[in-house]
């Protein structure tokens, strides 16, 4: 996927994640005007292309819609040669603006991983796609040690 289309997905995700995706209106679990469903679909497309651009293998991309009061989560688990990365995109319950979480992992079955790192919806709005790739690729470099969170 092109840099321009991935930047478009970043902007679209930032916009969706600044609106209320959790909708407590009975049968309308897709949020107002289907925004929750749009978030989950765009999130999966974005993460699949991100995995390819990061050069990951053993990739798992998934979406969990959650319940009616939450945004749902899009996730990516992928491996380089000796280490990997886990990425989640979600609307957190506390309104701190953190929408993308990433951390190093040792295997595709490592659900504890290292320390969490966060990006905000503002970062997704303003950063270029190459800047995002560079930030996430830093976990691949030898200088980034894997440490288990307490």
Predicted features by range, described:
Residues 33-34, 66, 96-98, 112-113, ...:
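Intrinsic-disorder/low-complexity loop/linker signature
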Residues 2-80:
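Negatively charged, low-complexity tracts enriched in Asp/Glu with abundant Ser/Thr
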Residues 1-11, 141-150:
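Short intrinsically disordered terminal tails
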Residues 71-141:
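Intrinsically disordered, low-complexity regulatory segments enriched in Ser/Thr/Pro
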Residues 40, 47, 133-147:
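Charged, low-complexity intrinsically disordered regions
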